[in-house]
């Protein structure tokens, strides 16, 4: 199933809020996981696993390091 950018953003915001405690309203496409949202590598792995389950995509560990912003993850899921 193809998801819209808004559906993915809303889903990611919910996941990030649950895992890292960042309010969903602060999660916007241009935000960097490390610099803006203060998410560490362990939380990033948890977010990736939750996103894989929610959106039915696979995000290999070697790809995870290239996903620096929320928009990067949105683009990856839409591929």
Swiss-Prot record:
Coiled coil region boundaries: none
Keywords: Cytoplasm, Fatty acid biosynthesis, Fatty acid metabolism, Lipid biosynthesis, Lipid metabolism, Phosphopantetheine, Phosphoprotein
Keyword ATP-binding attached: no
MF annotations from Gene Ontology: acyl binding; acyl carrier activity
Pfam families: PP-binding
Subcellular locations according to the entry: Cytoplasm
Carrier domain mapped to chain residues: 6-79
Pathway recorded for this protein: Lipid metabolism; fatty acid biosynthesis
GO terms under cellular component: cytosol; membrane
Annotated signal sequence range: none
SUPFAM superfamilies in the record: ACP-like (SSF47336)
InterPro entries with a match to the protein in the record: ACP (IPR003231), ACP-like_sf (IPR036736), PP-bd_ACP (IPR009081)
O-(pantetheine 4'-phosphoryl)serine modifications at: 41
Record-stated family: Belongs to the acyl carrier protein (ACP) family.
Record protein name field: Acyl carrier protein
Naturally occurring in which organism (per UniProt): Thermobifida fusca (strain YX)
